[in-house]
């Protein structure tokens, strides 16, 4: 039974996504269904956490929209994500960047690294 579950989850895993870590700025292209039509919506922000492993792995992206912080959590291997672009690689010393929720303006900047 365990082998069967592993085989099914292995074929569901996506391999077309770029490597990214907390602190990186991503542009996530999400498929949104409105009525009978489907369109792509772009959500761009900083990855503040990545958790789990395998098929249940998720990541959370935070952005500021009209002065309000918006966080959205995505499963990594969902078919709802059309593609992920890494806009900027950030250098941070934490795995979970919850402290960014309290910071405003220039204090919330993340140092950029070249890769």
From Swiss-Prot:
NCBIfam families: rplS_bact (TIGR01024)
Top-rank taxon: Bacteria
Primary gene name: rplS
The protein's role, per its UniProt record: This protein is located at the 30S-50S ribosomal subunit interface and may play a role in the structure and function of the aminoacyl-tRNA binding site.
Family annotation (PROSITE patterns): RIBOSOMAL_L19
Name this protein carries in UniProt: Large ribosomal subunit protein bL19
Subunit structure: Part of the 50S ribosomal subunit.
Keywords for this protein: Ribonucleoprotein, Ribosomal protein
Naturally occurring in which organism (per UniProt): Bacillus subtilis (strain 168)
Stated family: Belongs to the bacterial ribosomal protein bL19 family.
HAMAP family linked: Ribosomal_bL19
GO biological process: translation
Gene Ontology terms, MF aspect: structural constituent of ribosome
Gene Ontology CC annotations of this record: cytosolic large ribosomal subunit
Disulfide bonds: none
């Amino acid at each position: 039974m365990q082998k069967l579950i592993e085989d099914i989850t292995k074929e569901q895993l996506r391999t077309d996504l770029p490597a990214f870590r907390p602190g990186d700025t991503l542009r996530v292209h999400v498929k949104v269904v409105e009525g009978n039509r489907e369109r792509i919506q772009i959500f761009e922000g900083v990855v503040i956490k990545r958790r789990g492993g395998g098929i249940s792995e998720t990541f959370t992206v935070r952005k500021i929209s009209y002065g309000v912080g918006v966080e959205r959590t995505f499963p990594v291997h969902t078919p709802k994500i059309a593609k992920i672009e890494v806009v900027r690689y950030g250098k941070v010393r934490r795995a979970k960047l919850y402290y960014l929720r309290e910071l405003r303006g220039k204090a919330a900047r993340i140092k950029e690294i070249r890769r």
